[in-house]
């Protein structure tokens, strides 16, 4: 390939696929908790448990998806197969109104598809560049920005279709989006000829009684069924425990094999950053569960005579990420000097502080609802926007530190462990937190009366919890700042 200032043509097909994958995933996610409570009439406890189990397992399966791509399928085939499975899953989800058994199966199919897609689309993009190609960073930035476009549009479009037509049509729109992305991607197939394809030799090699392609088919059939059983029996927590134990064991092994003090110091930093990221995302993931139900029940969503669908509020977060990303880029540019560790903790303190501020606004909103029956929509939008801005100071900072580690061959493993803890485990904890809002009573007619006091309590506790994290992070920041200052004075 020639290295020019323009991007490889293949990237635009990857970007299109990424837009539609985000559209599909976040469109469905915006509807799911509302579908479980409003349409299937699940109580809040059951809905939160299933929602958090689903959001947790989508961060576990990419580990297996990456392995299958490396050994058998190649990134391109894995991505296409994952997109197809997600589209099928969304269609099956629409049928769960008439046959509830399809609910667990559909979520399991989506989890499997996400595992094949998410772990490999970035690797496929990386294959488009030579290792030293200066266009690489720009390509990844383009894909990230494009994904946010999809996640902004999806809740608006799917929420509108669900409100005007049906839940099944809302989920079908998510499926159509995924199919559209896959068709566009296939149209550019000729631009991916230089990327790694299916490993035919490995597929045909026999292992035990079957060739590997036979075992792959068995896996594609049994994995969704097994995951569906995990959802049905509420056993997903056991899968998370096993994955976490394995992840921590691998992390300990990497630490013990580190050769220098600097490597061990960097690993300790990553571990502490991951712990704070886990707490941050346990708070932030309330957006798809407890916050969504709070908006549906206690926020005045009317603009003139039009009632804004609850699902549309999920777009606020993605829009804030895109808009405030430019501010973050300026902040990074203006603060390139100084000690890197000090900057890292400063950004984490800012991110957690913004999360606390966002939930403080939500607490005020909930108190307003308690006093006047309903809260105002602008106050809700402000709180969600502040929380979206907070995200920019957490994940990018932690991921940047992981990629800087000077231990050969562990970056991918550390990234997977980070996603497991800050993704899967954080989503499980988010479900535990959200469950504290599921306090309700019944009136004489049998109608459900939801407790606004429960939302006030949970939002307030998160506000103070995030603020406590800020205090701890500031102590760490101050320690490193004084350490750097002392070192400079000693040199002078």
UniProtKB/Swiss-Prot annotation:
SUPFAM superfamilies per the UniProt record, alphabetical: MFS general substrate transporter (SSF103473)
Keywords, in A-Z order: Cell inner membrane, Cell membrane, Membrane, Peptide transport, Protein transport, Transmembrane, Transmembrane helix, Transport
GO-annotated biological processes: protein transport
Any Pfam family matching the protein: PTR2
Membrane-spanning ranges: 14-34, 49-69, 91-111, 138-158, 167-187, 212-232, 236-256, 269-289, 312-332, 344-364, 379-399, 413-433, 458-478
Membrane topology per record: Multi-pass membrane protein
Superkingdom assignment: Bacteria
Chief location category: membrane
Subcellular location: Cell inner membrane
Keyword DNA repair: no
Coiled coil (UniProt feature): none
MF GO annotations: dipeptide transmembrane transporter activity; peptide:proton symporter activity
UniProt cross-references to InterPro entries, sorted A to Z: AA/pep_transptr_DtpD (IPR023777), Dipep/tripep_permease (IPR005279), MFS_dom (IPR020846), MFS_trans_sf (IPR036259), MFS_Transporters (IPR050171), POT_fam (IPR000109), PTR2_symporter_CS (IPR018456)
One GO cellular component term noted in the UniProt record for this chain: plasma membrane
Function noted in UniProt: Probable proton-dependent permease that transports dipeptides.
HAMAP family recorded: PTR2_DtpD_subfam
Family note: Belongs to the major facilitator superfamily. Proton-dependent oligopeptide transporter (POT/PTR) (TC 2.A.17) family. DtpD subfamily.
Name of the featured protein: Dipeptide permease D
Organism: Klebsiella pneumoniae (strain 342)
Lineage: Bacteria, Pseudomonadati, Pseudomonadota, Gammaproteobacteria, Enterobacterales
């Amino acid at each position: 390939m020639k290295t020019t200032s323009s991007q490889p043509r293949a990237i635009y097909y990857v970007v299109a696929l990424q837009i539609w994958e985000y559209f599909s995933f976040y469109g469905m996610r915006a509807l799911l908790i509302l579908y479980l409570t409003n349409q299937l009439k699940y109580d809040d406890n059951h809905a939160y448990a299933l929602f958090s189990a689903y959001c947790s397992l989508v961060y576990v399966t990419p580990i297996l998806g990456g392995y299958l791509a490396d050994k058998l399928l190649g990134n391109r085939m894995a991505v296409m197969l994952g997109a197809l499975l997600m589209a099928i899953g969304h269609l099956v989800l629409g049928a769960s109104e008439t046959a509830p058994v399809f609910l667990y199966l559909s979520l399991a199919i989506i989890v499997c598809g996400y595992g094949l897609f998410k772990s490999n689309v970035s690797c496929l993009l990386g294959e488009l560049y030579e290792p030293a190609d200066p266009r690489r960073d720009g390509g990844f930035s383009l894909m990230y920005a494009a994904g946010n476009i999809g996640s902004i549009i999806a809740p608006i479009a799917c929420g509108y279709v669900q409100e005007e037509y049906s839940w099944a049509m809302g989920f079908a729109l998510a499926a159509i989006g995924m199919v559209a992305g896959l068709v566009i991607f296939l149209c550019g197939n000729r631009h991916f000829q230089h990327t790694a394809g299916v490993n035919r030799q490995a597929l045909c090699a026999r292992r035990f009684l079957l060739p590997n392609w036979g075992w792959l088919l068995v896996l594609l059939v049994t994995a969704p069924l097994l995951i569906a059983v995990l959802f049905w029996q509420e056993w997903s927590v056991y899968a998370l425990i096993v994955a976490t134990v394995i992840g921590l064991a691998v992390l300990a092994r990497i630490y013990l094999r580190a050769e220098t003090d600097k490597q061990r110091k960097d690993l300790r930093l990553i571990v502490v950053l991951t712990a704070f990221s886990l707490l941050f995302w346990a708070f932030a993931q309330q957006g798809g569960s407890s916050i969504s139900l709070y908006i549906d029940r206690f926020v005045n969503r009317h603009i003139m005579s039009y009632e804004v669908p609850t699902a549309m509020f999920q777009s606020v977060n993605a829009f804030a990420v895109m808009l405030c990303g430019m501010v973050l880029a300026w902040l990074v540019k203006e603060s390139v000097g100084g000690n890197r560790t000090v900057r890292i903790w400063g950004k984490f303190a800012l991110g957690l502080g913004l999360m606390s501020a966002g939930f403080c606004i939500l607490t005020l909103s909930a108190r307003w609802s308690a006093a006047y029956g309903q809260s105002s929509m602008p106050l809700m939008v402000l709180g969600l926007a502040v929380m979206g801005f907070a995200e920019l100071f957490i994940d990018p900072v932690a991921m940047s530190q992981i990629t800087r580690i000077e231990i050969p061959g562990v970056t991918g493993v550390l990234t997977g462990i980070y996603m497991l803890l800050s993704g899967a485990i954080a989503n499980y904890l988010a479900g535990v937190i959200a469950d504290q809002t599921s306090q309700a009573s019944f009136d004489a007619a049998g109608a459900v009366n939801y407790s606004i006091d429960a939302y006030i309590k949970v939002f307030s506790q998160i506000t103070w919890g995030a603020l406590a994290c800020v205090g701890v992070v500031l102590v760490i920041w101050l320690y490193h700042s004084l350490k750097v200052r002392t070192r400079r004075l000693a040199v002078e």
